């Protein structure tokens, strides 16, 4: 998984010893700047070369002799310096974005973990109220199926890309979600397979591996706050861990969730907390977009000069 991955050593790091499975490259600085050579390893050409030359084994690898065949474009030193400078700006923005994400996630955790836990979930939320069997309702039609793999681990992302013909629906495809529903994976919940759905796409069915939690009244308890509690509350995670049996596939059930304790807050307090966290999440989303675009921006710089 790490074959072709690169790292540049700088004197500021201090003395270092590298592992025997790594290869060190030293360059004639009159012709190639090390930082420039390092920037080439972020190029599409380099990544394609790695894919072509890595061994098709359980532990893919590329040896030193193979690396010696990789051709590096060598522009004038002043052009190399310009490339390094421009890519350096992108990397700085990238690092700043990562720091912002870490800070905002920490801030969200502090907000959530500053709340108490005094009331049972069942007092304010209904769980798994709607079901549907797509094999009979949509026998010859396609529907969207959300299974455990469709929900990200710890990021709240959810994919609606899986389309299945009704007659081919798995037996676990039964749960129906309404708008403003909290999705909780009941298997290995410590992986945080949780999500919040503000608006559910038509003809969407969820696996019975999820618990679907819907506020009895959004004016009493905001569903999105419950999602944030599942995602960030240390206390709620401890309750889940306590409820899980010591088995190969530790899980929680509806009765467990019914009795988990959550904070009892006024609706104004809830709205304030949700607004705070949404603002922090918006910054996180922008930072992640910047990080996602970094590779293509670096490539654009290389295309511009090489």
Which residue stretches match the model-derived regions?
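Periplasmic-binding protein-like
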Residues: 46-50, 235-240
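Short amphipathic beta-strand starts and helix->beta connectors
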Residues: 8-10, 53-56, 196-198, 242-246
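A short beta-sheet element
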Residues: 1-42, 173-175, 179, 183-233
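Non-catalytic DNA-recognition/assembly elements of restriction-modification systems
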Residues: 69-136, 142, 259, 264-274, ...
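Low-complexity, Lys/Gly-biased intrinsically disordered segments
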Residues: 3, 117-156, 164, 168-173, ...
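Short, positively charged
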Residues: 39, 52, 228, 241-243
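A short glycine-rich beta-alpha junction/loop motif
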Residues: 15-23, 55-78, 190, 204-211, ...
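A structural connector/turn signal
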Residues: 12, 57, 165, 171-172, ...
């Amino acid at each position: 998984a790490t074959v072709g991955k690169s790292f540049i050593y700088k004197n500021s790091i201090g003395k270092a010893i590298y592992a025997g499975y790594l290869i060190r490259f030293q360059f004639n600085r009159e012709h190639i700047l090390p930082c420039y050579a390092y920037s080439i390893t972020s190029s599409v050409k380099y990544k394609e070369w790695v894919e072509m030359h890595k061994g098709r084994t359980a532990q893919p690898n590329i040896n030193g002799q193979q690396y010696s065949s990789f051709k590096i474009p060598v522009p004038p030193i002043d052009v190399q310096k310009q490339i390094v400078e421009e890519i350096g700006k992108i990397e700085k923005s990238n690092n700043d974005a990562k720091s912002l994400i870490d800070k905002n996630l920490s801030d969200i955790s502090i907000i959530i973990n500053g709340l108490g836990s005094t009331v049972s979930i069942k007092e304010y939320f209904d769980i798994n109220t709607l079901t549907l069997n797509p094999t009979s309702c949509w026998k010859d039609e396609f529907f969207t199926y959300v299974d455990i793999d469709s929900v990200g681990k710890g990021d709240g992302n959810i994919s609606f890309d899986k389309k299945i013909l009704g007659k081919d629906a798995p037996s676990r495809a039964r749960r129906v979600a309404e708008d403003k529903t909290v999705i909780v994976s009941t298997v290995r919940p410590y992986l945080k397979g949780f999500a919040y759905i503000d608006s559910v796409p038509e003809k969407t069915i969820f696996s019975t591996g999820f618990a679907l939690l819907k506020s009895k009244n959004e004016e009493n308890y905001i569903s999105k706050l419950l999602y944030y509690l599942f995602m960030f509350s240390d206390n709620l995670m401890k309750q889940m861990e306590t409820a899980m049996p010591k088995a190969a596939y530790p899980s929680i059930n509806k009765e467990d969730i019914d009795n988990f304790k959550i904070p009892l807050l006024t609706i104004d307090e809830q709205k304030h907390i949700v607004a705070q966290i949404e603002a922090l999440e918006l910054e996180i989303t922008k930072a992640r977009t910047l990080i996602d675009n970094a590779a293509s921006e670096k490539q654009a710089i290389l295309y511009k000069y090489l």
